[in-house]
Amino acid sequence: VTDEAVGAHSDAAVHGSATTGLRVSGPDEAFLLAEEKLGFRTPIQFCWVLDDDPGLEAIERYAESLSTGLLHRAISRRRFPAARRRWVSSRVQPRIIVGARIDDAEIGAWADNLLRSADLRPAQGLGWRVHTTTTTRGRRVVVLLLSHLIADGEAIMRALVAAADGETTALADPDTARGARALAEDARDSARQIRSAARSVRAVARDARQRRRERREGTAPVVPNRPPSPPPTYDPYRATLAIVDVDRDLWHAQARQYGGTGNTLFTALVCGLVRRSGYPVGDQMRVSVAVSKRGGPEDLRANASGGIWLRVGEPQESPADLDYLRGLSRQAFAEYAKTGTD
C-alpha cells in the first residue's frame, strides 16, 4: 500500500458514522481520468435470476439499503490546484428501473443490452443503478449496474453484504468539502502532491540518465526486432459478451483433477479463449491477475487493488496440467509480496 493510499483512508471512521478526508487517489484517479479525458467508462454488472419472486417491494428495500452504504458516493469539485478530489456521499436518489416482462430465453440478451447501454455518471453521484423485470415463467431478474470508479470487486461484495445485513456506513456530507477548514486541508494536500510529483520527476530523470549511460557503454539490453502483428480480423471496438452457467462443484472438481485451483482453471480458460480467438499475443501472453490491498472495515477506499502479471508461454510449454500456471502464480505473488510493484 502506498503512502498516498494510506493517507486516503487513515482518517476514515468505522461502520455507522460519517467519514471525512477520504480522497480520490490511486486507481480511482486512473478510472476518473479515463472517463473525463478519454470517455472510457468501466461498468460492472451483477445479474441475479430468482426462481421465487420476492416482489418489487423487496428489490426497492434492498436498493434503499444500498443507498446508505459506500456505493452511494460522489466526487466533490477540486477547490485548490493539484489537490486530490474528495469522496462524499451522493445526494442522488437511488434509481430502480422496472422493465417489461421478458421471455426466459431473453434474459441474457436483456442483461447484455443493459450493460452496453449503461449511462452511469459516478463523479456526479449516479454511480450505480438497479434494473429489474420478471419472466414468462414467473422468475424475477435483478441487475445491478455500477461503475468501477466507485468500487472494486471486494468493495462491491462488502457493500452487498452490508446492505443485506442492514449496516450503514455514510461518507461525508458534500457540505464538508466546503468552508475554510476544507480549503486549508486541500492546500496541505496540494503541497503533498506537488512534492510527490517532484520526487517522481527526479526518479524519471535518474532512470533516463542510467539508460543513456548504458547505451554509451554498450551494456543496454538488446531488444530483438519482432515482425509486425497481423491486422485484427474482428472489430476491436465491440466487446463480445457471453453468459455461461457452470456448476460450482464440477468446476472445482475439474480444477483439482488437473492439479490446480478454481482460480488457475479460470486463468487457463481465459488463456485458451484468447489463443483460439486468433488475437495476436506474441511469444508470451501477458495475463493480469488482481490482488486486493484492502484492509479491514475501516478501509473505505473505492478501489484498493493491485495486480501481478503472468507471462504464459506457447501451449506446448503449458500442458493441461495446471501446475504450470500455479508455479507462475506462486513466483509472481512472491515477487509482489517483496516489491509491491503492480
Residue ranges and their predicted role:
Residues 30-31:
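Nucleic acid-processing catalytic cores of prokaryotic defense/repair systems
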Residues 4-22, 48-56, 61-68, 75-342:
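Soluble acyl-CoA-dependent acyltransferase catalytic core bearing the H(X)4D motif
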